[in-house]
Design a protein with these regions (language model features):
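Zn2+-dependent peptidoglycan hydrolase active-site motif and core
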Residues: 44-45, 55-103
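Acidic, glycine-rich catalytic/binding loops that coordinate metals and/or anionic ligands
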Residues: 2, 11, 51, 77-81, ...
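Extracytoplasmic
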Residues: 16-20, 45-47, 53, 82-84, ...
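A residue-level detector for short acidic-glycine micro-motifs
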Residues: 25, 60, 101-104, 126, ...
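Short histidine-centered loop motifs in beta-beta connectors
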Residues: 51, 95-118
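Non-catalytic extracellular/periplasmic "stalk"
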Residues: 1-43
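Flexible, gly/ser-rich surface segments that form the specificity/activation loops bordering the active-site cleft
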Residues: 62-78, 119-135, 144
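A structural signal for short beta-strand/turn segments enriched in small hydrophobics and glycine
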Residues: 56-58, 112-124
């Protein structure tokens, strides 16, 4: 859904999320949560630390927006606050990284801070236009999550483990079917694909 999302702002069509990724983490049973779907405590990865993928300078911080209820339509979400609590890091001229939907009150940086790869920016949450805890990440050509166009990016390396064949079943709490395929294995200098199950540096799925 990200790749085709377009925004008409100030008379200009923009595609800010063309290469965006929503990261979720499955538990050892390959489930998204364990417990009630609407309880944030059921999601073991809720509150996981979010690290900066690059060096750069913090140019935008939003915090204080409430958490949404998982499994339900977002309440009070607008185009202006769709990214929820978030941090934007200027990588270099014309390249900015967005880390969105952070946990309320969790941002660890301020505008003007210089960061290195691995710096903790905040904690994973469910704020803004979100119906389950996740990290929304993309690279864009300006500091605004709205008034920008997406830029392609790649990961240094990741381990492909297959694909989730039924995303709706995963989100609803059912056991997903992980389908191994020819893309399983080590990948370098590539971007992950839709519904692909990957691990980074032995961190798990």
């Amino acid at each position: 859904p990200h790749r085709g999302a377009t925004l008409a702002i100030d008379g200009t069509i923009r595609v800010p999320e063309r290469y965006a990724i929503d990261f979720i983490r499955m538990n050892p049973e390959d489930r998204l949560f364990d417990g009630l779907i609407g309880d944030l405590g059921s999601y073991a990865y809720f509150g996981t630390r979010i690290h900066s993928a690059t060096a750069g300078k913090v140019v935008r911080v939003q915090d204080g927006l409430p958490e949404q209820v998982p499994g339900a339509l977002p309440v009070g979400a607008t185009i202006q606050n769709a990214a929820g609590n978030h941090v934007v890091v200027r990588i270099n001229k014309g390249r900015y990284a967005l880390y969105a939907h952070m946990k309320t009150g969790s941002t660890r940086v301020n505008v003007g801070d210089k960061v290195k790869p691995g710096k903790v920016l905040g904690l994973l949450g469910n704020s803004g236009n979100a119906s389950a805890p996740h990290l929304h990440f993309h690279v864009m050509d300006s500091a605004s999550p709205l008034k920008s166009n997406a830029l392609p990016f790649t990961f240094k390396a990741f381990e492909g483990q297959g694909f989730v064949t039924d995303l709706d079943a995963l989100v609803a709490g059912g056991d997903p079917l992980i389908q191994p395929n020819r893309l399983a294995g080590r990948h370098r200098g590539q971007l992950t694909l839709d519904n692909q199950v990957v691990s980074f540096g032995g961190s798990g799925r």
